């Protein structure tokens, strides 16, 4: 008999589903290190393998859209570090992990530490823009914290000498690689702040692997850079190398040479700017003097223009000019009047009716002659057509047929006789000849037999 408050009863499906949800929601994404075994890649492109250590193992799957980002081919027995989600395959109740990313174990562990420290310092606000100190402009002294034998120091000094040879440089030599390097870098930063000899610091080194650059991913170095009162420019490795020091520094330069470019002034450019400013000043002075000279000349000219004798001379000149203009205007007026009179005379001559009458009479005579010619031609053509019509009518007239010896005989009812069967003996007939008619009586009717010819 079951107790009154019985525990929940799960089906197998519900149990597997509940466990899967607990694993996915409670565990979330985790980092796992282990050795690869039983690696397979079917036609789908997915990877299936087992991740194990000395005492345990777990099944893993890495789908194609994730494994295409892996830069190496996993091998049996290889130690790797994976980032994965824990889940459960419900149909079989198999516990497994779904891998999102994979790295070789050594580099992967460093990368994991890098990400953890980055997240920690970012959460504390060490990367916030509000804490970034502005660089001095211009810098009066530059401090360099790097290896005294490295290529980075050579590059920095070469650029500073080329751009600003007079800029003082203080070198704080330190190791940049190895177990002692982080502590030495921290002490060099603190020493530079204690002496307060320079107003900007370059902290960096040349390129290398992740392990080579690891000193600049050390938490002690990051906090020392953040605590520095002197602005810090990080210059670690190449442009693609990004360290924790780059995030904490007041400014990140992609290379040591670029850092030297940032903190220094280009003396050649400054010289060009001074020369340009001098040229602008000289041009401004020349313009000012020319403007003052022109103004003085204008005032002097105006004073000269106000002299009484000059005014009288100008008025006399104006009077002479007006007299010439009046004379010229009068001559032009008379000339225009004469030209107008000539044009009117020409127009009047053009309007004389006699030439028009003569032309009209000539035109009428021409038209009368043409009309007479047309009438004569039309009359001749009409006569010719009439003669042709008469000739044609005469040719088809029955009278013409009678004139050739033929006659037309009609019965008493006026019908023209064509066959002998139309008449009977004793009937009266009328025959039309060329010059009159004949009436006759039928005495005898004699039909004509037609001969029939056989065609062979």
From Swiss-Prot:
Main location: cytoplasm
Gene Ontology CC: cytoplasm; exodeoxyribonuclease VII complex
EC number: 3.1.11.6
Alphabetical keyword list: Cytoplasm, Exonuclease, Hydrolase, Nuclease
InterPro entries reported in the protein's UniProt record: Exonuc_VII_L, Exonuc_VII_lsu_C, OB-fold_nuc-bd_dom
Keyword Acetylation recorded: no
Compartments in which it is found: Cytoplasm
Leading EC class: hydrolase
Single GO biological process annotation from the record: DNA catabolic process
Pfam families linked to this entry: Exonuc_VII_L (PF02601), tRNA_anti_2 (PF13742)
Domain of life from the UniProt record: Bacteria
Any one Gene Ontology molecular-function term assigned to this protein's record: exodeoxyribonuclease VII activity
Biological role stated in the UniProt entry: Bidirectionally degrades single-stranded DNA into large acid-insoluble oligonucleotides, which are then degraded further into small acid-soluble oligonucleotides.
HAMAP family cross-referenced by the UniProt entry: Exonuc_7_L
Record text on subunit structure and interactions: Heterooligomer composed of large and small subunits.
Name recorded for this polypeptide: Exodeoxyribonuclease 7 large subunit
Species classification: Bacteria, Pseudomonadati, Pseudomonadota, Gammaproteobacteria, Enterobacterales
């Amino acid at each position: 008999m079951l107790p009154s408050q019985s525990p929940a009863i799960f089906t197998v499906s519900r149990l597997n589903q509940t466990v899967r949800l607990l694993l996915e929601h409670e565990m979330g994404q985790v980092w796992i290190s282990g050795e690869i075994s039983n690696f397979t890649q079917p036609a789908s492109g997915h990877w299936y393998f087992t991740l194990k250590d000395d005492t345990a193992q777990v099944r893993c799957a890495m789908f194609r859209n994730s494994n295409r980002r892996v830069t190496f081919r996993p091998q049996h027995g290889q130690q790797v570090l994976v980032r994965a989600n824990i889940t459960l395959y419900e149909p079989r109740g198999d516990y497994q992990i779904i891998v999102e990313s994979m790295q070789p174990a050594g580099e992967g562990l460093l990368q994991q530490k890098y990400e953890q420290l980055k997240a920690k310092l970012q959460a504390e606000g060490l990367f916030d823009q509000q804490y970034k100190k502005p660089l001095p402009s211009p810098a009066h002294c530059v401090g360099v914290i790097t290896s005294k034998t490295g290529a980075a120091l050579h590059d920095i000094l070469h650029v500073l000498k080329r751009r600003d040879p007079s800029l003082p440089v203080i070198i704080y030599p330190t190791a940049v690689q190895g177990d002692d390097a982080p502590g030495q870098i921290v002490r060099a930063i603190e020493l530079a702040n204690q002496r307060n000899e320079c107003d900007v610091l370059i902290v960096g080194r040349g390129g290398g692997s992740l392990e080579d650059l690891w000193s600049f991913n050390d938490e002690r170095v990051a906090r020392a850079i953040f605590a520095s009162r002197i602005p810090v420019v990080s210059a670690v490795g190449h442009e693609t190398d990004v360290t924790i020091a780059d995030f904490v520094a007041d400014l990140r330069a992609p290379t040591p040479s670029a850092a030297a470019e940032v903190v220094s002034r280009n003396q050649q450019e400054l010289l060009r700017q001074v020369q340009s400013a001098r040229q602008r000043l000289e041009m401004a002075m020349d313009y000012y003097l020319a403007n003052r000279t022109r103004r003085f000349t204008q005032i002097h000219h105006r004073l000269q223009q106000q002299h009484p004798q000059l005014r009288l001379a100008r008025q006399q000149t104006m009077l002479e000019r007006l007299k010439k203009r009046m004379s010229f205007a009068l001559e032009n007026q008379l000339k225009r009047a004469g030209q107008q009179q000539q044009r009117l005379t020409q127009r009047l001559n053009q309007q004389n009716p006699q030439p028009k009458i003569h032309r009209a009479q000539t035109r009428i005579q021409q038209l009368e002659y043409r009309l007479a010619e047309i009438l004569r031609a039309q009359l001749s053509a009409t006569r010719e057509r009439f003669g042709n019509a008469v000739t044609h009518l005469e040719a088809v007239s029955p009278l013409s047929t009678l004139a050739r010896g033929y006659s037309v005989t009609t019965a008493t009812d006026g019908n023209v006789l064509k066959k002998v069967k139309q008449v009977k003996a004793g009937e009266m007939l009328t025959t039309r000849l060329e010059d009159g008619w004949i009436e006759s009586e039928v005495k005898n009717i004699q039909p004509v037999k037609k001969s029939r010819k056989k065609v062979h």
